From Swiss-Prot:
Species in which this protein is naturally found: Picrophilus torridus (strain ATCC 700027 / DSM 9790 / JCM 10055 / NBRC 100828 / KAW 2/3)
Annotated keywords: Cytoplasm, Protein biosynthesis
Pfam families noted in UniProt: eRF1_1, eRF1_2, eRF1_3
HAMAP family xrefs: Rel_fact_arch_1
UniProt-recorded Gene Ontology molecular function terms: translation release factor activity, codon specific
GO CC terms, sorted: cytoplasm
Described function: Directs the termination of nascent peptide synthesis (translation) in response to the termination codons UAA, UAG and UGA.
Signal peptide: none
Family under the similarity heading: Belongs to the eukaryotic release factor 1 family.
Protein name: Peptide chain release factor subunit 1
InterPro entries: eFR1_2_sf, eRF1_1_Pelota, eRF1_1_sf, eRF1_2, eRF1_3, Peptide_chain-rel_aRF1, Peptide_chain-rel_eRF1/aRF1, Ribosomal_eL30-like_sf
């Protein structure tokens, strides 16, 4: 059974593929069908488009558009009604080498319901409705503040986004006594109030458009400034109600946002970044054990653990893009597999014959199939956190935790 992580990975990969495709003319059809749309109504609409497209002046464009519409109508015969989230067709002749084109068909059942029926015939596929479904749902508002500076931002999934950084004009405390000192103190408080108002406006303008999507707001900073800022009327009530916690942190610039997220993720474990950090840190603890822990990394070691059904958890970087090339000897049928296509045709180790390329697969898809067969849990991690970047840069984007330490052959 496919995990939500894997479905999102496949969905994102499909959109990246579609984005790179182009037609010679306006020959690529994007058809979005909401779940409550009658298939018979869609077919009738396509018949009308077919009639209209018969008048296209360019012979090749007319031929290709009509072929695409026919292809969609023939496939719609297999649907009594759209799936629960709707149906999206991407069909048309895409440009290949030189002046050549080839028919391309992609049918997607999106992760979220399609809201609007749409038919577009263009030189590229229209992906806007689907791309909006990739937007991160795990969103938190971030504010770090003291009297000298403040930074407002978001945590979206595992990615920190800076909205604005501001330095204040609040002068340092005046140590001389007398009337001039009291007047100077009043000026300091006026300047501080103006600065807090400005930061409140920045936060209000940033957070309010997304207030329904924001899970919580965290405020951090040194001293009591953060409490004062929250208690007064600098933030809208809707935002105040979302404030989950306040944290003592040492910095109020961009590094302060990272420190705030670190503190928040320690106390609130249902955050996506918390879950990723916990998983990766567990793996790191295992590989550091001097007696040999359950941690495993490296493509060959991961595949061996999967094939022996000894991998409990597979960790994959969500930016990992590799293919596996399988070559077969025409004489003895031995095979060799590579994750980078060899520059020269490989030779068979037994009879020195030139081997033939018989299969080319996506590495992540292959690993997921093996994981499914082995009952292995699969987690995709991003490169937005330090831990996630470490999985990609130090371990090649693949890591795992075994069920038991395999016995070493004597």
């Amino acid at each position: 059974m496919e995990s939500e992580d894997y479905k999102r990975y496949e969905f994102k990969k499909a959109l990246e593929e579609l984005k790179d495709l182009h037609g010679r003319g306006t020959e690529l059809i994007s058809l979005y069908i909401p779940p409550d749309k009658q298939i018979s109504d869609v077919v009738q609409y396509l018949r009308e488009e077919y009639s209209t497209s018969s008048n296209i002046k360019s012979k090749s464009t007319r031929k290709n558009v009509l072929a695409a519409i026919e292809s969609i109508m023939s496939r719609l015969k297999y649907y009594k009604q759209p799936p629960e989230t709707g149906l999206v067709f991407f069909v048309g002749h895409i440009a290949t080498r030189g002046d050549q084109t080839e028919m391309y068909t992609k049918i997607i059942e999106p992760p979220e319901p399609i809201q609007t029926f749409m038919y577009k015939c263009d030189s590229n596929f229209h992906l806007e409705q689907l791309e909006s479904q990739l937007k991160e749902k795990d969103i938190y508002g971030l504010i770090v503040i003291d009297r000298k500076e403040a930074t407002v931002g978001f945590l979206k999934g595992t990615r920190i986004e800076v909205v604005d950084y501001e330095q204040s004009l609040v002068p340092s405390k005046h140590h001389q006594g007398g009337q001039s000192s009291r007047r100077f103190e009043r000026l300091i408080e006026i300047a501080a109030n103006d600065f807090f108002k400005k930061i409140g406006e920045i936060a209000n303008n940033a957070f309010m458009p997304l207030i329904k999507d924001i899970n919580a707001v965290f405020i951090g900073g040194p001293g009591a400034t953060k409490e004062y800022f929250l208690e007064k009327d600098y933030l809208r009530n809707e935002i105040k109600q979302k404030v989950k916690d306040l944290f003592d942190i040492g910095y109020t610039d961009e590094s302060g946002l990272r420190e705030l997220v670190e503190k928040a993720s320690e106390s609130i474990k249902d955050m996506k970044i918390s879950r990723e950090k916990d998983i990766i840190n567990r793996f790191l603890r295992e590989i550091k054990k001097p007696e040999g822990g359950l941690g495993v990394y490296g493509e060959d070691a991961i595949i061996n653990a999967l094939k022996s059904k000894n991998l409990d958890l597979l960790i994959i970087s969500d930016t990992l893009k590799k293919r596996r090339y399988t070559y077969k000897c025409p004489v003895c049928n031995d095979t060799k597999t590579f994750t980078e296509k060899p520059r020269e045709t490989p030779l068979c180790d037994k009879d020195n014959s030139e081997m033939e390329l018989v299969d080319e697969d996506d590495l992540v898809e292959d690993l997921y199939k093996l994981a499914d067969e082995a009952g292995t849990n699969v987690v995709f991690v991003s490169e937005d956190s330090d831990e996630g970047r470490l999985i990609k840069t130090a371990f090649g984007g693949l890591a795992g935790i075994m069920r038991y330490v395999p016995a070493i052959a004597p």
